[in-house]
Amino acid sequence: MPQNVVLPGPAPWGFRLSGGIDFNQPLVITRITPGSKAEAANLCPGDVILAIDGFGTESMTHADAQDRIKAASYQLCLKIDRAETRLCPAVSEDGKAHPFKINLEAEPQDVNYFEHKHNIRPKPFIIPGRTSGCSTPSGIDCGSGRSTPSSVSTVSTICPGDLKVAAKMAPNIPLEMELPGVKIVHAQFNTPMQLYSDDNIMETLQGQVSTALGETPSMSEPTASVPPQSDVYRMLHDNRDEPAAPRQSGSFRVLQELVNDGSDDRPAGTRSVRPVTKVHGGAGGAQRMPLCDKCGSGIVGAVVKARDKYRHPECFVCADCNLNLKQKGYFFVEGELYCEMHARARTRPPEGYDTVTLYPKA
């Protein structure tokens, strides 16, 4: 229902807007500041603004509506529409006012919520067909086996051994026994899905009654288990295979035979084996491993080549002083490798000639 609301100036007005033609939604008040002028004018969240100071909001964007509200200085006239009647009382809580909604509609309640069959008072039970040994409780008709209305049921004497028979004949009917100074109510239907053994429940009930009467409880003998030497037991155990020996691989068996067939006079112990680099003769056309010109072993990795001869980097030394000739000049004299000083000493020119060292061009 459209309503006209006037808020006295100046700003702030105390409410928040949302929507606009740019959002394809009407201008709606989303929040009211407690204690503000909007709350005093009884504005509520959810009110749709139809006009601001006489200007319709059908074609207003959100920014235009904010500008129109900011332009109002002395008072702000709003035309609002409320879909339903809202009660917005100013309730003060700890000095702050908070508008709230009140739903006056009563919620339906199930009248049968508190009526459940398990909440009824247990009724006493008597063994049908038994006429002696136990007296008949008040409120029980022995001839028909049906219970009659009675406020209090009492039992003068009770036979604990007959409880199992009574409970098994009517497992869903509660048993109520009033003994001197104690009252025992047994409702077997409270055990969900028969999770507990019926025999255990009966033994417990019989023990309680016997203890209350001052008698020694007589427990039934446990059911004998299946003998372990039955036909099925023997059939299952006779078909089992004997434990087989662990399986060994073919290589292990060959080594085991060699060890068993070997002579016993060989000395026992360990020996140190030093790995030796072997030169494998490759097939024709395959690249062979280079041999060191000094030590004669194969070269794996870095190699130094001088005049078609290969050496290890640590073997590339002078034959006299063992000076490493890497990054230095080297000389071959009679097939041996020397440094410059020892090469001059071993090479003496004829008389009248001087020794001149010639270095290859880079």
Curated annotation (Swiss-Prot):
One GO term of the biological process aspect: actin filament organization
Pfam families: DUF4749, LIM, PDZ
UniProt xrefs under SUPFAM superfamilies: Glucocorticoid receptor-like (DNA-binding domain) (SSF57716), PDZ domain-like (SSF50156)
Major place of residence: cytoplasm
PROSITE patterns, sorted: LIM_DOMAIN_1, LIM_DOMAIN_2, PDZ
Cited InterPro entries: PDLI1-4/Zasp-like_mid, PDZ, PDZ-LIM_domain, PDZ_sf, Zasp-like_motif, Znf_LIM
Tissue expression as described in the entry: Highly expressed in skeletal muscle and at low levels in the heart.
UniProt xrefs under Gene3D superfamilies: 2.30.42.10, Cysteine Rich Protein
Keyword terms, alphabetized: Cytoplasm, LIM domain, Metal-binding, Phosphoprotein, Zinc
Subunit structure: Interacts with ACTN2. Forms a heterodimer with PDLIM4 (via LIM domain).
Function: May play a role in the organization of actin filament arrays within muscle cells.
Descriptive protein name: PDZ and LIM domain protein 3
Organism name: Rattus norvegicus
